[in-house]
Amino acid sequence: MEPASLEKDSQPPGQANTEKANPGQGQANAGSASPDEAATSHHRHGSPKVGSLEHPERIENVPGHVIPILRQEFDDFDTESTRFLRGELDGEEFTKFRLKQGVYGQRQPDVQMVRVKLPLGGVNPDQLDAFAAGIEEYVPLRKGHITTRQNVQMHHVPLPDAAKLIRELGDAGLSSREGCGNTMRNVTGDPRAGTLEGELFDITPYAGAYVRYFVRHPTTQSMPRKFKTAFAAIYDEDNAITRIHDLAFLPLVRGGVRGVEVRVGGGTSIMPRIAPTLYEFVELDNGEYLKVAEAIVRIFDRTDWLRANRARARIKVLIDKIGIDAFRDLVEEELTGDWVVERDFSLDPVRFDHDEEANAPAKPDSYATANGDLREFDEFLASNVRRQRQAGFCTVEVVVQRGDLIPDQFRGLAQIMRDYTGGYARTTVHQNLVLRWVRDEAVYEVWRRLSELGLGDAGAQEVTDVVSCPGTDSCKLGITSSMGLNQAIQERLVEMQIEDELTRRIHIKMSGCPNGCGQHHIANIGFYGASIKVGEHTIPAYIPHLGGAYEGGEVRYGERVKARLPAKRVPEAIERWIRFYESERSDGEEFNAFVARVGTPEFESRVKDLAMPIEFNLENMNYFVDWSKNVPFEVIRGEGECAV
């Protein structure tokens, strides 16, 4: 659906020239895959609905089935993991193989993390049931974790069980293919795409085509480093935070033609960059965006000097070195290559076409109304519910604390989806779940059902909805227990009983190391894990950032605060900063504007005593133990496998 009145012909940000506006003009746009690529790229020249020996992938345009399942991969994983456990296969060779199937080593020996990719966060009720069953059977901690890239991860899985788990999840159409390693990672997007007021069109079919085009693509199997892509649903809103990604697509319409602005070279970690504009407008329906994307990844894949230092092997490093204009020249040259005429960029074989509206729930004959709990429901309604552009429907955002769900919650959510959404939901980059196509009349019943599962909290994407990565709970690169700190901060914020509307808009995020998986760079108040040496002992600590932003189409990285706070003092620091903001701000002044006006030194001065040295003794022993842990803290960092 594309409302004519919403057509956007205005010039987007970036340099304007005809070369940028029309990449690869005159280049061939169709063809067939070369024979040596047929086994892995048949989806670029055909779309069989049922598997066969020649075309084993099955493409189904049903919710949650974006990535075609290839069952031979499960057989291969069984075989190779058995060989490895018998000592018949080299460890490094097996690790590379394992990562492509989304099975990742943890800081704990002999167990794995299984990462299931959910393109644009899409998941259906049967798949939530499959997660519940798999977690009960194979995951010792009995929980699954929604990540900041809309995946679901399961931790502490023994290798033989990981082989069984990915196969059983595959039976439900869930894929971990290329969930790890130097591959095309999960493609993320706005969880409300297709339902938003102000949308030019639904980006979902085009994002789905992108996923299908590049999964198992020969060029993306062993790149210098991982490659992350995101699709926005609305250019000026960008709830997918596309600008921090390696490759970003933002929707536009020009002259009635659907297209995207293409940005490339974003990223966080120790070298944060906002992706600059490569092309202001690239067409979608003719497959031009797939052609441009392949040119980009081909250049990235063969830039071998990036492989010399894996800490600086992302595409942002290349663009930082040569500049976006020089990179555009490389793309234009790449688009003249012979490979272009050997490809079929038609979207017909790979588009993810599914009419959600046709399957949306009917209006109920009767429905419950608030009874003695109106205040709590009104809070939920104000913060978690958003009206869809389709009359009579809304989306409901479920707050999932720390992104963790237990089997009963997976199953309960599945049943709510069946009863009230037509079966539609998507995870978010904030570790929540958005229920789509909920009838306006059914929202109260949905809230009551969510509350029975412990998932009825109000405050979605507000100050109490704290985001963090797994940290030292499982990650080899983790320095601190970011999940433990998340819980401590969330509990402190709830105790503060914050009712101020401007304060509730503050976003707090943390990562267990500088890499940024917890999005600390773009939070209003962000932290990353560090440490403080006290003689032979070590205190878990955090480095704060202030003033980050990602809403309203703007991305800004926060400013580092010159303080190293012991982990156990971080909740106190947050409370002081919030009270400082509430007492000293101007009328209607947002938190980031306040930070910019008063400066970070003012914030530093208010926690100076919290950053003072701590003597190691029995009275202070608590500071030397991390949140949610019961042993003295020490920095134990392994070698991350994401760049193996």
PLM regions: where:
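Peripheral terminal and linker regions in Fe-S/redox and tRNA-modifying enzymes
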Residues: 2-644
